[in-house]
């Protein structure tokens, strides 16, 4: 059985800059694969190509050169587009752009209705999806009265109701306050842990990447680093060189080690830092 959900092979994506009459290379010869059930974070600065790469994962964009396969389906083949978008859902940065109805449960029902799902099955999917994101009690509410974090969870429920095997999140917390960010990240982690949904999270918040199985770092359209969170974030120099931060506790461990203190440099959480400092007593 093939366990790959997404496979990118030598992907190049160019677009024309009409002002300067030249082509811009947004993604430059990128190759990686994502297994079914995996939680992968793609990090990068603004303009690194990470969001462009995300849009290739459910055929919103297709490569200029190279190939992208979603569950073995070639995104360049237009006959696959419908099935690819059923297989890989997408949640965007601004939930207001993804919410289409005036009542929460009607919004969540919108996707399956357009798939031609039976009304009884739609009701079941809507209830289950809202329960998964802990928004069931708000099903009769108007989305515009909800907080940013709650709106984003409704948008996630709308994608879940279409029963995808993979969800690509394109900077879903960029417009949220810290509590809203925490709500959404906890929801994403739960979807992966409890329901086995493949997660691809595009972000520039380092703390959001700590829980991932794997981290991919992009810069100027290229894949520059790949590994588990400890491998990536303990390489503080390389991250700083490409203009990215690391979690604060990781940077603290790095600075302490530079000062000659015998401390592990691959610390990712506050609890790990506390344990390490207690060990040094």
Swiss-Prot record:
Binding positions (ATP): 44-51
Membrane topology: Peripheral membrane protein
Subcellular localization: Cell membrane
SUPFAM superfamilies tied to this protein: P-loop containing nucleoside triphosphate hydrolases
Cellular component GO terms, alphabetical: ATP-binding cassette (ABC) transporter complex
Alphabetic keyword roster: ATP-binding, Cell membrane, Membrane, Nucleotide-binding, Translocase, Transport
CDD domains: ABC_cobalt_CbiO_domain1
Highest taxon above the source species: Bacteria
InterPro entries xref list: AAA+_ATPase, ABC_transporter-like_ATP-bd, ABC_transporter-like_CS, ABC_transpr_CbiO/EcfA_su, ECF_ABC_transporter_ATP-bd, EcfA_1, P-loop_NTPase
Domain named ABC transporter: residues: 6-245
A Pfam family this chain is assigned to: ABC_tran
Enzyme Commission number: 7.-.-.-
Keyword GTP-binding recorded: no
Predominant localisation class: membrane
Subunit-level organization: Forms a stable energy-coupling factor (ECF) transporter complex composed of 2 membrane-embedded substrate-binding proteins (S component), 2 ATP-binding proteins (A component) and 2 transmembrane proteins (T component).
PANTHER family listed in its UniProt record: ENERGY-COUPLING FACTOR TRANSPORTER ATP-BINDING PROTEIN ECFA1 (PTHR43553:SF24), HEAVY METAL TRANSPORTER (PTHR43553)
Role: ATP-binding (A) component of a common energy-coupling factor (ECF) ABC-transporter complex. Unlike classic ABC transporters this ECF transporter provides the energy necessary to transport a number of different substrates.
Protein name: Energy-coupling factor transporter ATP-binding protein EcfA1
Annotated source species: Clostridium tetani (strain Massachusetts / E88)
């Amino acid at each position: 059985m093939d366990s790959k959900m997404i496979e990118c092979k030598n992907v190049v994506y160019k677009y024309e800059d009409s002002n300067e009459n030249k082509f811009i290379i947004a993604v430059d010869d990128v190759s990686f694969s994502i297994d079914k059930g995996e939680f992968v974070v793609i990090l990068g600065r603004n303009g690194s190509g990470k969001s462009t790469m995300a849009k290739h994962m459910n055929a919103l964009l297709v490569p200029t050169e190279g190939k992208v396969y979603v569950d073995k389906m070639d995104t360049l083949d237009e006959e696959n587009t419908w099935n690819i978008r059923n297989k890989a859902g997408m949640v965007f940065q601004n939930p207001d752009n993804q919410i289409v109805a005036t009542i929460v449960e009607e919004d969540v029902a919108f996707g399956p209705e357009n798939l031609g799902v039976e009304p009884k099955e739609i009701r079941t999917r809507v209830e289950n999806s809202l329960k998964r994101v802990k928004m069931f009690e708000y099903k009769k509410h108007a989305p515009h009265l909800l907080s940013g974090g709650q709106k984003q969870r409704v948008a996630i429920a709308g994608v879940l109701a279409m029963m995808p095997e993979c969800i690509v999140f394109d900077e879903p917390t960029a417009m949220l306050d810290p509590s809203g960010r925490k709500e959404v990240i906890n929801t994403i982690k739960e979807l992966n842990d409890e329901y086995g949904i493949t997660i691809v999270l595009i972000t520039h918040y380092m703390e959001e990447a700590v829980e991932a199985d794997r981290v991919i770092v992009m810069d100027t359209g290229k894949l520059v680093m790949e590994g588990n969170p400890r491998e990536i974030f303990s390489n503080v120099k390389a991250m700083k060189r490409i203009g990215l931060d690391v979690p604060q506790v990781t940077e603290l461990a790095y600075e302490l080690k530079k000062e000659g203190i015998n401390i592990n440099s691959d610390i990712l959480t506050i609890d790990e830092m506390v344990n390490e400092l207690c060990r040094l007593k």
